[in-house]
């Protein structure tokens, strides 16, 4: 389903038959952590972030097949020609209340997240408006924030 946030396309999809694959993918993430315990640091604070080659692991084939289908359809919906290539994928494990991702940018690319498991009272994912200039704050240019002028928007992360 196509949504917009600040006039930027935003898709939210559910993986078919997710519950059939969920537990095996969660186990595979922990196996990946056991194989690569040092992980990588990009944006994850106090949690684990795997190396960025998770999409080459056969245990996630069903997930990345689904992601590729969504990416191709998303590109078609916005009339984007060319080949869609999944270049990086990694897993984050947030296993304590101190874990979080720092705000970061995936510029000039499609990017996404997929939640295998979401605890009760989990935090929300935040999207910040790249079109706003911080120097405009306080000038009263926007009386009522809307999807094009709000500073940020939040989505509760669903599993699957």
Could you say what each language-model-derived stretch is?
Residues 34, 87-90:
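Short, charged low-complexity linear motifs
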Residues 91, 95-160:
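Catalytic core of non-heme Fe(II) oxygenases with the double-stranded beta-helix
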Residues 1-81:
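Non-heme Fe(II)/2-oxoglutarate
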Residues 56-88, 95-109, 113-120:
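Active-site region of the double-stranded beta-helix
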Residues 7-10, 86, 122-123:
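Sequence-level motif detector for i,i+2 pairs with an aromatic at +2
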């Amino acid at each position: 389903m196509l949504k917009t946030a600040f006039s930027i396309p935003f898709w939210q999809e559910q993986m078919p038959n997710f519950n059939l694959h969920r537990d095996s993918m969660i186990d595979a993430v922990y196996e990946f952590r056991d194989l690569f315990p040092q992980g990588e640091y990009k944006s994850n604070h106090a949690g684990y972030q795997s190396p960025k080659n998770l999409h080459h692991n056969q245990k996630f084939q069903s997930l990345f097949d689904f992601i590729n289908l969504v990416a191709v359809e998303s590109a078609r919906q916005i009339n984007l020609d060319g080949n869609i290539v999944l270049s990086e994928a990694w897993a984050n494990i947030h296993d304590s209340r101190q874990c979080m991702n720092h705000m970061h940018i995936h510029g000039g690319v499609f990017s996404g997240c997929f939640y295998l498991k979401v605890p009760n009272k989990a935090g929300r994912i935040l999207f910040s408006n790249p079109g706003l200039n911080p120097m405009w704050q306080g000038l009263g240019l926007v009386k009522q924030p809307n999807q094009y002028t709000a500073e940020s928007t939040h989505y509760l992360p669903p599993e699957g």
